[in-house]
């Protein structure tokens, strides 16, 4: 199948109580039980990441655990931050880095994002790097935008280290909107990301999975992933219903298996 397709979800801070977070994690685990053709992950609200980790570990499941953020250092005086040491201890696997909301509201710059990526790789976890553009533009301009972001965020990291990197393409203008970006636009954007990445890290770019995030729903998932450069989807609020998340997984699987 080549690059293994991905479906993941970030709960941001929508599910912050232990009971609801655990129930959701158990529900999607049960609904996707036995799924081996896709890689699945959940990024729970940070305050409930421990009980969610316990819930996932206490049952047969294929849902990987990740964190929505980490501190740029593993240990030290950073009040209120979340250490990657905790995620490792929880047997987490993914680290979301560079989301639009972190870049915008918390003023995280490329240097800080680069530090977090390097720390994630040092701990043998998977960085999920989020990138996007502020407004719709042409393919050539998109490539220029993406190459600038990637060059800064991936600075001083060898291509060999980046084989496990996941890129989540989330156009800023589509986050939280009623509808996702058009599938044709997403296809061009993903192609430009891979081309920009290839110019920076060479053949390793072929191993990097690029998924789309931004108002993904069960109605749009199929058309969005119907392109060889779109390796999956990063779901938000339209996956808060476990049945909807499971349906998105089913749709992505059908499309990607048919394509191979």
Which ranges hold each PLM region?
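Active-site loop-to-helix "anion-binding N-cap" substructures in soluble metabolic enzymes
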Residues: 1-168, 172-260
